[in-house]
Amino acid sequence: GPGSVLGTRVASAAVSTLAKMHKAPVFEFDAMKIAAYAVFCRGGNSDFSILAPSRKGFANLLNFSNAEVECEREIEDENLASFCKPRKFLLKQKNTVSKNLSEIEEIEISLSETYEILKRYPNLATICGFPPDAKSLTKREYVKWKAQAPI
């Protein structure tokens, strides 16, 4: 989902600390894939696209067909029409989205629905390895990140 790099790092540090303290595994899953399988399980045509806002001018796209993920990629908003399937859904992650995404039917996936999808399709979750110790971004990494951040 959306969030700052700092927020992601804080969450990662908190989860890693709890996992080490309690010797518990931490699982990861892809929210786009969970959304796709949720739409599929709700019934109807199994040929559709899931979209989610990404950085400014871009969206994440997942195409789903025949009960499988066809592709998942980040794409420029202006090119969405050529890559999306006719039936498409917007995974609601932000209150405001670009004009190209604002016309798409929104879907929300609850925690209980996420749990049910993961029970039904356990291969969508994987156990995370412990991350390496945190370190500061190099100047080059920082410049690369800052160039992508909306100012």
Please state what every model-predicted region is.
Residues 1-28:
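DPxDG-like acidic metal-binding loop motif
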Residues 27, 31-151:
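Oxyanion-binding and handling regions
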